[in-house]
């Protein structure tokens, strides 16, 4: 019984991953990011987050629904398209835009990578990295790495906080793989401590933790504010 449950769980996970990649490929150019598939006994909801939702017409959604049913056995899929809040901080969007940019102009890959890296950082990212691997110049395949800001790939941050994406640029010499990694501004970094100014300190909050420290802090604030007025 347990083995059947595990087998079904793995099959569902594989179905989700393969269908997500298929949707991104089918809707290439619409800058699809996150794809959520919610399976219920009545209907299967497919929620697609896109940076260009207007590109996904009702006709296109209907055709995609038929393909998902035929290829993946997803019965009665209902497709919903939602906009992305900040496309410049989305790894999937940046990876696709860069891949399509390189396809249009293979010689401009360095300039494009630098431009998108600046776009990510200007959007408020803590750190970002773009890696391009393939045969873009010369006979042999090479790897180019572009990095900005503070990007940590290990530990809790590397496991839970990084937004990663992979895309492929289809070129005449072959294909080029594009990896994009972004550490977003709202990421929780354990070893970064923010200090509040005296005006921002709440005595009520400190009292909940330690009344003695709250009393000392109250006296300090009174002295600080008095000195500031003088």
From Swiss-Prot:
GO CC, any one term: cytosolic small ribosomal subunit
Indicate yes or no for the key word rRNA-binding: yes
| Gene3D superfamilies membership | 3.30.300.20, Ribosomal protein S3, C-terminal domain
Pfam families given in the database record: Ribosomal_S3_C
> Which terms under GO biological process does the entry name?
translation
Q: Which family does it belong to?
A: Belongs to the universal ribosomal protein uS3 family.
NCBIfam families per the record? Answer: PRK04191.1, uS3_euk_arch
Q: Which protein is depicted? A: Small ribosomal subunit protein uS3
**Source organism:** Nanoarchaeum equitans (strain Kin4-M)
Write the gene name: rps3
């Amino acid at each position: 019984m347990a083995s059947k449950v595990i087998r079904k769980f793995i099959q569902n996970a594989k179905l989700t991953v393969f269908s997500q990649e298929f949707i991104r490929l089918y809707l290439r150019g619409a800058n699809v990011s996150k794809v959520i598939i919610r399976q219920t006994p009545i209907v299967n909801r497919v929620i697609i987050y896109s940076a260009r939702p207007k590109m996904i017409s009702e006709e296109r959604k209907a055709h995609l629904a038929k393909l998902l049913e035929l290829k993946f056995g997803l019965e009665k899929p209902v497709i919903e398209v939602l906009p992305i809040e900040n496309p410049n901080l989305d790894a999937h969007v940046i990876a696709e835009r860069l891949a399509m940019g390189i396809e249009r102009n293979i010689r401009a890959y360095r300039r494009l990578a630098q431009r998108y890296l600046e776009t990510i950082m200007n959007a408020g990212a803590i750190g970002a990295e773009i890696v391009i691997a393939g045969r873009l110049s010369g006979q042999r395949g090479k790897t180019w790495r572009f990095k900005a800001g503070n990007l940590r790939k290990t530990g809790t941050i590397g496991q839970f906080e990084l937004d990663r994406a992979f895309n492929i640029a289809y070129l005449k010499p072959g294909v080029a793989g594009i990896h994009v990694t972004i550490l977003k501004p709202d990421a929780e970094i354990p070893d970064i401590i923010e200090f509040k100014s005296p005006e921002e300190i709440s005595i009520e909050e400190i009292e909940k933790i330690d009344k003695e420290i709250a009393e000392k802090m109250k006296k300090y604030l009174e002295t600080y504010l008095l000195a500031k007025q003088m």
